[in-house]
């Protein structure tokens, strides 16, 4: 099983990625691979959250301005992942990122491509 997520880098690179794993443990391993370790959850409404490196400040990771703008959170560092959330048997569980974030990533990438073309 895989789930769609949106990865946001500190340099404002934003793209769709896949979180893999049949079990929660395997999915967490996949998330750790993207973020570099354990993660904290930043809630973004009922159906989405942003996952960030739990020790990002201790690791002196760079500020992620785009993730801060999208989440409304005052300080985020390092890589961030947006995933969906839904109610499960044991509380909330992760699922595909909501479509509005997939569209946002596509729109931002399109705008960046146009800007890069104009700069060339």
Task: List each model region and its residues.
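Domain-length accessory/inserted modules outside core catalytic folds
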Residues: 2-120
């Amino acid at each position: 099983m895989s789930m769609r997520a949106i990865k946001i880098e500190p340099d404002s690179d934003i793209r769709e990625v896949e979180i893999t794993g049949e079990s929660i443990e395997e999915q967490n391993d996949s998330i750790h691979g993207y973020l570099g370790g354990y993660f904290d959850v930043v809630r973004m409404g009922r159906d989405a959250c942003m996952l960030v490196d739990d020790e990002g400040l201790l690791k002196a990771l760079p500020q992620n301005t785009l993730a801060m703008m999208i989440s409304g959170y005052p300080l985020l560092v390092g890589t961030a992942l947006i995933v969906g959330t839904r109610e499960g048997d044991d509380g909330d569980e992760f699922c595909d990122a909501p479509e509005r974030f997939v569209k946002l990533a596509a729109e931002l990438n399109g705008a960046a491509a146009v800007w890069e073309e104009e700069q060339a």
